[in-house]
């Protein structure tokens, strides 16, 4: 999260090969310095690459799955867990919207707010620390903008770290 505090520095943490390809191409075209953080457990990830599609620009999240009951917001490797969680919830007749942030700076506040205002519930998945983290910022955005509609408190789930 400390990288997000550096003025003018863009930060990308893509989960999908197509996003990594297009975000890297966008980074080459802009004047802002950009940091790409690739999760090593995503290196063997395969997927369709559409070279003709320009892809979404920095600061635009990708809604991987539309839903109406809960918004699951994440980035990088945890997107895989978000998608699995949505599949499990679907078996329980719970419709989860999955949002892949793709870039953490600029952060797509509008997509987060719009989704949570629609679903009225939010789960933020991350591998980071519990405090002073990206999920802390996302939770803050949700509370500042959606507190009147929330049916339950926002849940932050942090993947256990191995150290």
What do these predicted ranges mean?
Residues 1-30:
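Conserved thiamine diphosphate
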Residues 25, 32, 87-91:
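Charged, amphipathic alpha-helical interaction segments
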Residues 27, 31-33, 138-142:
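Glycine- and acidic-residue-enriched helix-capping/beta->alpha junction motif
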Residues 40-163:
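Thiamine diphosphate
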């Amino acid at each position: 999260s400390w990288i997000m505090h550096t003025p003018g520095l863009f930060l990308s943490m893509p989960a999908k090969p197509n996003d990594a390809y297009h975000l890297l191409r966008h980074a080459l075209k802009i004047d802002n310095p950009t940091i790409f953080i690739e999760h090593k457990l995503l290196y063997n990830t395969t997927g369709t690459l559409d070279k003709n599609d320009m892809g979404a620009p920095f600061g635009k999240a990708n809604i991987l799955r539309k839903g109406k009951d809960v918004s699951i917001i994440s980035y990088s490797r945890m997107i895989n867990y978000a998608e699995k969680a949505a599949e499990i919830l679907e078996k329980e007749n719970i419709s989860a919207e999955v949002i892949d942030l793709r870039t953490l700076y600029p952060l797509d506040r509008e997509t987060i707010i719009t989704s949570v205002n629609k679903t009225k519930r939010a789960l933020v998945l991350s591998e980071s620390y519990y405090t002073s983290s990206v999920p802390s910022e996302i939770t803050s955005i949700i509370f500042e903008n959606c507190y009147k509609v929330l049916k339950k408190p926002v849940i932050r789930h942090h993947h256990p770290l191995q150290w």
